[in-house]
């Protein structure tokens, strides 16, 4: 699969031991903040995402800083939808806003690069909803399948992903792109953590 090969070749999928935002230790890390550096694969990913959300009724896109902003921006431009973004913490200067958008009365598509447990996404949903918006769906490039779908479901928000981590890792496990030791670590992680 071109997407997965590109992730490995461009060091956007790293193998090792990584601490995630959720606090979990993972044998792989998706560094999708740089995916937009590779136009062809990024453009293809955006096209696939648009195909998955074309029947969702929303009127504004909110990207989560920082990983979700490039993805949200491309989708916004291609679909002709207004765009805003949300930080996970105040910046401490200027207007000190967390949400950079007027979401009142709007149906929101929330966008990020990766979903793991759903902590950041659910926090963003709460903030947007408290400002008068209504998150109708959340879109990510990769769902790590570690609870985000269930967590967002508690808010009535559907999680849509372009790729599931299971398909990415299964491809890697059946390839010569990573070592046998790394394959074993990933298999062990899959058994313990993937829904």
Swiss-Prot record:
InterPro entries: OPRT, Or_phspho_trans_dom, PRibTrfase_dom, PRTase-like. One of its GO terms (molecular function) is orotate phosphoribosyltransferase activity. It comes from the Archaea. The keyword Magnesium applies. Its cofactor is Mg(2+). It holds the Pfam family Pribosyltran. Belongs to the purine/pyrimidine phosphoribosyltransferase family. PyrE subfamily. GO terms for biological process: 'de novo' UMP biosynthetic process; pyrimidine nucleobase biosynthetic process. It comes from Sulfurisphaera tokodaii (strain DSM 16993 / JCM 10545 / NBRC 100140 / 7) (Sulfolobus tokodaii). It catalyses: orotidine 5'-phosphate + diphosphate = orotate + 5-phospho-alpha-D-ribose 1-diphosphate. Keywords: Glycosyltransferase, Magnesium, Pyrimidine biosynthesis, Transferase. Homodimer. The gene is pyrE. This is Orotate phosphoribosyltransferase. The lineage of its organism: Archaea, Thermoproteota, Thermoprotei, Sulfolobales, Sulfolobaceae. 5-phospho-alpha-D-ribose 1-diphosphate binds at residues 87, 91, 112-120. Signal peptide: none annotated.
């Amino acid at each position: 699969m071109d997407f997965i090969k590109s992730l490995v070749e461009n060091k956007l999928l790293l193998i090792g031991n990584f601490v995630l935002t959720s606090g979990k230790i993972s044998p792989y890390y998706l560094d999708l903040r740089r995916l937009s550096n590779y136009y062809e694969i990024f453009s293809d990913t955006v096209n696939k995402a648009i195909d998955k959300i074309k029947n969702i009724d929303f009127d504004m896109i909110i990207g989560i800083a920082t990983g979700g902003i490039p993805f949200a921006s491309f989708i916004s431009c291609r679909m002709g939808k207004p765009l805003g973004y949300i930080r996970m913490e105040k910046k401490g200067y200027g207007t000190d806003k967390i949400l950079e958008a007027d979401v009142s009365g709007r149906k929101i598509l929330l966008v990020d690069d990766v979903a793991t447990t759903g902590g950041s996404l659910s926090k963003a949903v709460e903030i947007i909803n408290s400002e008068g918006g209504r998150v109708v769906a959340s879109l990510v490039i990769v769902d790590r399948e570690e609870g985000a779908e269930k967590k967002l479901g508690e808010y009535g928000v559907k999680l849509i992903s372009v790729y599931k981590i299971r398909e990415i890792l299964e491809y890697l496990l059946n390839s010569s792109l990573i070592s046998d030791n790394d394959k074993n670590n990933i298999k062990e992680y899959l058994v313990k953590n993937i829904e």
